[in-house]
């Protein structure tokens, strides 16, 4: 847990341009791992913030015509500042509007990580793909989708689902931790995007080990929280997840991580 230990020591400033539904949960999750979240959205202050920040999360969950240009502007400012971007194209396949905006953003700025479920990442590489809301699609071949997305966008791809897939360069990793309760809490996936950003430490081409650790820390914490005797369902799971992120230690991490490199 080298990256998490560094987060707990250095408290990296993590800027989150995220959706209105999840801001509080995302901020609290980042605080739980030791990061310092800032939910800054104004392009007018981006240049100053990005000089001292370690990463930027862009999450389009509540995309509107009013914030389109702000998102493009902050992404370009992040590029100019050498700040890595984690892009979460929430529900990109649900509407033509979302898909067109995501394509525009990815043409207008360079992102370091694209994170989404299989349906969302498929929508970025296949114009005919559709999806149901923000749900993951267990029937899709996530490894193949991730590899195709990497080939197109030349950026790290993280696909979440029952198993999580990470593709960076010539490596493809499958991670098998997590809990079904994550799908019962709104904003859990959005928090993961923020946590990935917290692990980047200003690396615009992040090491795959940072991504593996970020995803595994989150999912192992979810497992432990779900197994807690005080967890009665989604309502008690959420605060227990934050507590477990705060207390997670090396022993638990190493005992539980389930990882496989695939062709």
Curated annotation (Swiss-Prot):
Its cofactor is Mg(2+). It catalyses: 5-(2-hydroxyethyl)-4-methylthiazole + ATP = 4-methyl-5-(2-phosphooxyethyl)-thiazole + ADP + H(+). Pathway: Cofactor biosynthesis; thiamine diphosphate biosynthesis; 4-methyl-5-(2-phosphoethyl)-thiazole from 5-(2-hydroxyethyl)-4-methylthiazole: step 1/1. Keywords: ATP-binding, Kinase, Magnesium, Metal-binding, Nucleotide-binding, Thiamine biosynthesis, Transferase. Substrate binds at residues 39, 187. Its EC number is 2.7.1.50. InterPro entries: Hyethyz_kinase, Ribokinase-like. Gene3D superfamilies: 3.40.1190.20. This is Hydroxyethylthiazole kinase. It comes from Staphylococcus aureus (strain MRSA252).
């Amino acid at each position: 847990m080298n990256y998490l230990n560094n987060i707990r020591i250095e408290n990296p400033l993590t800027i989150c341009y995220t959706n209105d539904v999840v801001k509080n949960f995302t901020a609290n999750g980042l605080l739980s791992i030791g990061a310092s979240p800032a939910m800054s959205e104004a392009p007018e202050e981006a240049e100053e913030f990005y000089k001292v920040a370690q990463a930027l999360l862009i999450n389009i969950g509540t995309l509107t015509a009013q914030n389109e240009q702000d998102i493009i502007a902050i992404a370009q400012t992040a590029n100019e500042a050498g700040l890595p971007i984690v892009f979460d194209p929430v529900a990109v396949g649900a509407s033509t509007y979302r898909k067109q905006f995501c394509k525009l953003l990815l043409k207008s700025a360079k992102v370091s990580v694209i994170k989404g479920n299989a349906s969302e990442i498929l929508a970025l590489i296949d114009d005919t793909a559709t999806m149901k809301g923000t749900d993951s699609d267990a029937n899709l071949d996530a490894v193949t989708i991730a590899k195709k997305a990497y080939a197109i966008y030349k950026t790290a791809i993280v696909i979440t689902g029952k198993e999580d897939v990470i593709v960076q360069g010539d490596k493809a990793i499958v991670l098998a931790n997590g809990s079904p309760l994550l799908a019962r809490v709104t904003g859990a996936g959005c928090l993961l995007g923020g946590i990935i950003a917290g692990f980047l430490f200003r690396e615009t081409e992040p090491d795959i080990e940072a991504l593996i650790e970020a995803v595994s820390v989150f999912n192992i914490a979810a497992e432990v929280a779900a197994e807690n005797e005080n967890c009665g369902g989604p309502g008690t799971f959420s605060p227990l997840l934050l507590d477990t992120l705060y207390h997670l230690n090396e022993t638990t991490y190493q005992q539980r991580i389930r990882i496989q490199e695939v062709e």
